[in-house]
A protein has these predicted regions:
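Periplasmic/cell-envelope proteins involved in peptidoglycan metabolism and beta-lactam response
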Residues: 1-304, 327, 349, 403-413, ...
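Beta-lactam-recognizing serine transpeptidase/beta-lactamase-like catalytic domain environment
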Residues: 2-5, 77, 227-240, 280-333, ...
Length: 619
């Protein structure tokens, strides 16, 4: 039977559809086959590596920081090991009630309230979101064993060995060595911290901060194979990278000088500071501030009360380094600058005579000597010896419109950055006509510059503001004959084997032209002030076997008792070191600061002073 004509197109269409469907099926199978072949053959290695990585855990191994040593090798800062309790917050239960329960239990184990646990998490996540949270350091082994036995209950909790700074002598040179702490979010953005991770520790102050790149080591990596539950498998330790310890930093600090200075300040029990420096090369042999603090306080969490006592106490303020960050009038120790300005500008010569009748009168106001004494006719050397205020008032009056005091203060380093390698310094202030007249024009003071301002400045009073380090630079420049040293505390870097791998070089900042005759006259006056009766410090240094040049100072501070100062260059006449001591509310310079300076010089020269009877002088 032959098909009807109408059936032929219908069968053709059906065959076409079957052919199309068959082609599509073949194409789909071809795509599927190619994809399987691609996964298993071409990308097989890639997915095998990913599968292996899913069975491997990497843990950063923190590197110990280098030690900080005194110049003789005495350890000022080292490390100790500690066990830290870490929490991965992404492993906490998603259910709020279960999360609260786990955090409460963790807090109980770590002796922390739930509130404190949450605050710790919040504060650390603000710095580095996603990083493990350090709940507590110095946890005991009993807690470690308990967590190992109950790992399923605390899947996000681990214990890691960390290195914590240790200070063998407590607060010794605290402001110099500084502190360390976890890197902040802002610091992570800085180029100098490239490659670091949240939770890493870096120097935050002192040499720990300035020389962090030497002290900070390189973290290592430990790789461990884990099972499907994320638990370590037996024998699962894989190839690891050991951490590289940091290098040791050797300071210029002389331990005996440092200890003597700190003990002298502590004995007085009043806020103060000292600086002892090699004037030839700028090496800081000792520098301290009182009250001080133990840097170990930064190695563990602080209470708000502890933090406030350290930072916000308006009187003690232990965190402030009074040697570099203070701002005081210096009293009669400034007379050295006045003398040099007058000599170098031809206002007087060493043999010029000024009559001291006990006071000068200016605009109806009398400026008197301390104690109301009068010394009669004086040249420069005896004027320095007895610290005649009238002599220097007269010099200030003669120079009041010349800007000589301001120029020489600046040349010698007052109210000028010293270049100290510790960073923070108070700027200081040398009052001038321009400064006060601008304040007056802006309505910030009641009067413009006057002769009385310069008269006050000539004796280190009035609006003068400086710190012990700046005064040390000024005296050093006089002692060297004009070379301005760069003060520094870093000497060299050693590797772990004690080999010197870097020596620091600090070149002089500038040279000031000082006439040798001017220098000689001033040093002679300072020598007689310190060791020849009736010098103002002869009762303190008269029995010291090393000849020195020194000057007492008594500064008036509104709202405070007099501040005590002493500045010394030793040995005289060719000094190697300078020592500056100041004690707030310490009274006359010979009462507090001078005896403290004597203790420092006795330690440096390893010689003791004998008691002397001296009428001495007043300021």
């Amino acid at each position: 039977m032959f098909p009807r004509p109408s059936d032929i197109p219908r069968r053709s269409r059906l065959s076409l559809r079957i052919a199309v469907l068959g082609g599509v099926a073949v194409a789909l199978f071809a795509v599927l086959f190619f994809r399987l072949w691609n996964l298993q053959v071409l990308d097989g290695g890639k997915y095998l590596a990913e599968a292996q990585n899913n069975r491997t855990r990497e843990y950063r191994v923190l590197a110990p920081r280098g030690d900080i040593l005194a110049r003789d090798g005495e350890v000022l800062v080292e490390n100790r090991t500690s066990l830290a309790l870490l929490l991965a917050t992404d492993k906490l239960p998603s259910d709020p009630a279960e999360e609260r329960k786990e955090l409460t239990e963790l807090g109980r184990l770590a002796h922390m309230s739930l509130k404190k646990v949450r605050r710790t998490i919040r504060e650390q996540e603000e710095v580095a979101a996603g990083a493990p949270i350090t709940l507590r350091r110095d946890v005991g082994y009993d807690l470690v064993y308990y967590l190992e036995e109950n790992q399923r209950r605390f899947p996000g909790v681990t214990v890691q060995r960390v290195f914590v700074r240790r200070y063998p002598d407590g607060s010794r040179a605290a402001h110099v060595v500084g502190s360390v702490g976890e890197i902040s979010g802002d610091q992570l953005k800085e180029a100098q911290y490239k490659g670091l991770s949240p939770g890493d520790e870096v120097g935050q102050s002192g040499v720990e901060h300035v020389y962090d790149k030497y002290l900070r080591g390189t973290p290592g990596v430990t790789r461990i194979q884990v099972n499907a539950l994320g638990q370590p498998t037996p024998g699962g330790q894989l190839l690891s990278e050991a951490p590289t310890p940091g290098d040791n930093l050797v300071l210029t600090i002389n331990p005996e000088v440092q200890a003597a200075g700190e003990a002298a300040l502590a004995e007085r029990g009043l806020p103060g500071a000292f600086v002892t420096m090699n004037i030839k090369n700028g090496e800081i042999l000792g520098m301290g501030s009182f009250p001080t603090y133990d840097p170990a306080v930064f190695t563990h969490p602080m209470t708000q009360k502890q933090y406030d006592a350290l930072v916000n106490d308006p009187i003690a303020a232990p965190i402030i380094d009074r040697a570099t960050e203070s701002a005081y009038p210096t009293g009669s120790t400034y007379k050295v600058i006045t003398a040099l300005a007058a000599l170098e500008n031809g206002v007087i010569t060493p043999s010029s005579t000024i009559f001291d009748n006990g006071f000068i009168e200016l605009a109806g106001e009398k400026f008197r000597n301390a104690g109301g004494v009068s010394y009669g006719p004086l040249t420069l050397v005896p004027a320095l010896q007895v610290s005649s205020d009238v002599f220097f008032y007269e010099l200030g009056l003669r120079m009041w419109d010349k800007n000589y005091l301001q120029q020489w203060s600046h040349e010698l380093g007052i109210a000028r950055p010293t270049g100290l390698d510790l960073g923070s310094e108070s700027p200081g202030l040398v009052p001038s006509k321009k400064w006060r007249d601008e304040l007056f024009a802006n309505g910030e003071t009641e009067r413009p510059w006057s002769a009385g301002d310069n008269v006050q400045l000539a004796t280190g009073q009035g609006d003068l503001q400086t710190n012990p380090l700046q005064l040390a630079i000024a005296y050093s420049t006089l002692g060297t004959g004009g070379t301005v040293p760069t003060p520094h505390v870093a000497k060299e870097v050693e590797d772990a084997a004690g080999r010197v791998i870097k020596e620091f070089e600090f070149h002089p900042r500038r040279h000031v032209k000082i006439d040798p005759g001017s220098r000689q006259a001033i040093l002679e006056g300072l020598h007689e002030a310190a060791q020849v009766d009736p010098g103002t410090a002869a009762g303190v240094f008269g029995g010291f076997p090393v000849p020195i040049a020194g000057k007492t100072g008594t500064a008036e501070r509104p709202g405070h008792a007099d501040q005590s100062w002493f500045a010394a260059l030793a040995p005289y006449p060719d000094p190697r070191i300078v020592t500056i001591v100041t004690i707030e509310e310490g009274g006359f310079g010979a009462e507090s600061a001078a005896p403290s300076a004597l203790a420092i010089l006795e330690a440096y020269f390893n010689k003791q002073a004998t008691e002397v009877s001296s009428s001495g002088g007043t300021e």
